[in-house]
């Protein structure tokens, strides 16, 4: 049964940026932003009028310091790397989408014998890699930043061969009480928030096998 912040809130006519459903409900509001929830896929998203522009968004990303030699960072990324490695064939091809200024997950997978390509809107904007298909794709701490998750989701599906894997890492919405205290929403570049039900909706719609690993890793497999 779908649970929203309040069954008595007025429906707001903001199209969901993921499934395009025209009906959303007020979910939460703080001093900086209003958050809405789609009545169909349950995506929680920031009011589009309150998102950063591209210049401010990149300035925030430039503050990130991800060192490929940082053992702690590698341990963090191993939460998605290890289950992907368990499921793919030797010498597979993959793409790390949204790899950031210090690609690390791709290096970890290359070290295990796989052939990796990189793409990032700001730091590795080589769009030629988006014209190929791969055995697997990874996107760690990426999906929550997407202004157009509908378009990028379809792009991800197109990047992966039949039977291929998509490995994602993102924190997921639990309920509005937890959301109110959630530090994850406070990052100004975090604009869409998925729940398990959102991923279940997408998996059913797009005929994907879905697995949750722990609290923040999502694996999806395309049909053969």
Feature locations, PLM:
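Feature marks short, surface-exposed loop/turn motifs that line or immediately flank catalytic pockets
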Residues: 125, 174-176
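Conserved N-terminal segment of class I S-adenosyl-L-methionine
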Residues: 1-136, 140, 153, 169, ...
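Alpha-helical subdomain
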Residues: 177-181, 185-196
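Conserved beta-strand signature within the Rossmann-like core of class I S-adenosyl-L-methionine
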Residues: 163-171
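Residue-level detector of anion-binding/catalytic polar loops
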Residues: 115, 165, 209
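A short His-aromatic
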Residues: 141, 145
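Short conserved AdoMet
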Residues: 89, 147, 161
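A short, conserved alpha-helix within the catalytic core of class I
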Residues: 146-156, 170
